[in-house]
């Protein structure tokens, strides 16, 4: 078995510690043709033989994962849909409101590496079942917190991160073990449609359930029931495919996992993974800020324009902007994800660097439109919505492509760990702190102006302009990814095919001549 610690295997000059990867453009031995470096893709019959699952069953598993992904994001942004009511109920300001999202993301970020480690080594189906069941109970409990205990709301939102971490680090790796090549890209695009659609449904459900029930607490009681359905679907429908078998094109046992520290070292030395994660961090910063603050900003804009009454203590706040922003998020997400995947798929045949270049174009293109949406808010709410629509469409082009990049530059036994640390990085520097940072800047700016509805609007307007600058930095990170993407992808392919192996820290090697080349094998395999 290629991944065994005791079986003999090649460790030639293409080992990362020994020399460059063959087939890399510009290096000796390179064909210069990216198509020739692509591994053979198994057909439907081959996939069924390797995974033990029919095409219909595999598609059904993806459908269940999409449902849960949609549910997770729906729950996350339900809070944003009723944020003005939460501020009134708990009597808190913008900075405290930003803490709601920051605490959730922080716990999610801390727990992600734990589930990443477990997901690379244990049954992924049962890990997700336990996490989502716990998340459903905690979410339901958060809807019964009295107004004088805001800290309890923060605590429960932090515990919700358990369910998110158990799912987000594991689900994409299941899809990677069911499909390959263009089929995997299509399935990932379907999976990541759930992010903007679920986010939009969260705004819509939060605002509409609040209006129907007359109490914002009921908005938090919708998703727990749907979470129970998700656990049942996971238990009854999802089956665990062998890790990495579809890429090795054989029914041999999957690659053996290496130590956690070896995984971390390999990921840190993978420039495509590191730079694409930094680019995705910028996406998380911008989307996290807009997710929490855009409806509140639009409401303040309407108040300044005289189109809606202000949100006063004791009154129910207008939810029309949450509804409209939710619809925009759904539409732009579907359009952006689909557009990004299709453009990348078409360009990939002629340019192997298409994926990071499309991501860079999306981020760099979204920055000026987001800036214009903020600048125009005091003059025309219609123009603001138009620019938000364009900016969010370009921003959404990244979701599925970034996931695809990770899956083909990281070997199967490290993917959950890679997903986890991409989550940690993107949230640590992205949406864990961005809602709080935006709220903090807004509060500080308001202190310098006389209290008024205009000063509340201007403070949030100026603080949100930081998003356009961060988006431009993210585009630069994706341009850097394009420099390394070909070599890193080829290295991962060679490793999966058993043609490239990393020397373990405790694995003594000897050199055996073979056809004029040195072949390194473990001492244990020779003694046996």
From Swiss-Prot:
GO molecular function, a single term: transmembrane transporter activity
Modified residues (Phosphoserine): 518
N-acetylalanine, modified sites: 2
Coiled-coil residue windows: none
Membrane spanning stretches: 50-70, 98-118, 127-147, 160-180, 187-207, 218-238, 278-298, 323-343, 357-377, 381-401, 421-441, 465-485
Keyword Transmembrane helix: yes
Biological processes annotated in GO: lysophospholipid transport; phospholipid efflux; regulation of lysosomal lumen pH
InterPro entries for this protein: MFS, MFS_dom, MFS_spinster-like, MFS_trans_sf
Keyword tags: Acetylation, Lipid transport, Lysosome, Membrane, Mitochondrion, Mitochondrion inner membrane, Phosphoprotein, Transmembrane, Transmembrane helix, Transport
A Pfam family hit: MFS_1
Catalytic activity: a 1-acyl-sn-glycero-3-phosphocholine(out) + H(+)(out) = a 1-acyl-sn-glycero-3-phosphocholine(in) + H(+)(in); 1-hexadecanoyl-sn-glycero-3-phosphocholine(out) + H(+)(out) = 1-hexadecanoyl-sn-glycero-3-phosphocholine(in) + H(+)(in); 1-(9Z-octadecenoyl)-sn-glycero-3-phosphocholine(out) + H(+)(out) = 1-(9Z-octadecenoyl)-sn-glycero-3-phosphocholine(in) + H(+)(in); 1-(5Z,8Z,11Z,14Z-eicosatetraenoyl)-sn-glycero-3-phosphocholine(out) + H(+)(out) = 1-(5Z,8Z,11Z,14Z-eicosatetraenoyl)-sn-glycero-3-phosphocholine(in) + H(+)(in)
Membership in a protein family: Belongs to the major facilitator superfamily. Spinster (TC 2.A.1.49) family.
Record's subunit section: Interacts with BCL2 and BCL2L1.
Protein name: Protein spinster homolog 1
Organism: Homo sapiens (Human)
């Amino acid at each position: 078995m290629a991944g065994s610690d005791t079986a003999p295997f090649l460790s030639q000059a293409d080992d990362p510690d020994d020399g460059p990867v063959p087939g890399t453009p510009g290096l000796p031995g390179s064909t210069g043709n990216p198509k020739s470096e692509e591994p053979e893709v198994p057909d439907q019959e081959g996939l069924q033989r390797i995974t033990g699952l029919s095409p219909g069953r595999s598609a059904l598993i993806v459908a269940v994962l999409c449902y849960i992904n949609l549910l997770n994001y729906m729950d996350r942004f339900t809070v944003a849909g009723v944020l003005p009511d939460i501020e009134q109920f708990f009597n808190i300001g913008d900075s405290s409101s930003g803490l709601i999202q920051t605490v959730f993301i922080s716990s999610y970020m801390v727990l992600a590496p734990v589930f990443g480690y477990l997901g690379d080594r244990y049954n992924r189906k049962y890990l997700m079942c336990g996490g989502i069941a716990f998340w459903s109970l905690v979410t339901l409990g958060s809807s019964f917190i009295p107004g004088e205990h805001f800290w309890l709301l923060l605590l429960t939102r932090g515990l919700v991160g358990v369910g998110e971490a158990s799912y987000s680090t594991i689900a994409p790796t299941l899809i990677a073990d069911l499909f390959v090549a263009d089929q995997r890209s299509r399935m990932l695009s379907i999976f990541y449609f759930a992010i903007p659609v679920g986010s939009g449904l969260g705004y819509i459900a939060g605002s509409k359930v609040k209006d129907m029930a007359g109490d914002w607490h009921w908005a938090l009681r919708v998703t727990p029931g749907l979470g129970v359905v998700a656990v049942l679907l996971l238990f009854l429908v999802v089956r665990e495919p062998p890790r990495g078998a579809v890429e090795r094109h054989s029914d041999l046992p999957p690659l053996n996992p290496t130590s956690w520290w070896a995984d971390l070292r390999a990921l840190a030395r993978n420039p495509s993974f590191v730079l694409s994660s930094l680019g995705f961090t910028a996406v998380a910063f911008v989307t996290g800020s807009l997710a929490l603050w855009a409806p509140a900003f639009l409401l303040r804009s309407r108040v300044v324009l005289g189109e809606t009454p202000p949100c006063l203590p004791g009154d129910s706040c207008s939810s029309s902007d949450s509804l409209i922003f939710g619809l925009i998020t759904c539409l732009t997400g579907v359009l952006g994800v689909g557009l990004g995947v299709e453009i990348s798929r078409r360009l990939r045949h002629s340019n192997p660097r298409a994926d990071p270049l499309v991501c860079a174009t999306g981020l760099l293109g979204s920055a000026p439109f987001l800036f214009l949406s903020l600048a125009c808010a005091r003059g025309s709410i219609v123009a603001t919505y138009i620019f938000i629509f364009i900016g969010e469409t370009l921003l959404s082009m990244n979701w599925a492509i970034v996931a695809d990049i990770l899956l083909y530059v990281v070997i199967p036994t490290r993917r959950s760990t890679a997903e986890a640390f991409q989550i940690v990085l993107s949230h640590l520097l992205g949406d864990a702190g961005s809602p709080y940072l935006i709220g903090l800047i807004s509060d500080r700016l308001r202190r310098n102006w006389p209290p008024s509805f205009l000063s509340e609007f201007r403070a949030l307007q100026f603080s949100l302009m930081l998003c356009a600058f961060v988006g431009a930095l993210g585009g630069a990170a994706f341009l850097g990814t394009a420099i390394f993407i070909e070599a890193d992808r080829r290295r991962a392919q060679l490793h999966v095919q058993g043609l490239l192996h990393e020397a373990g820290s405790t694995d003594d090697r000897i050199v055996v001549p073979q056809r004029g080349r040195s072949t390194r094998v473990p001492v244990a395999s020779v003694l046996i």
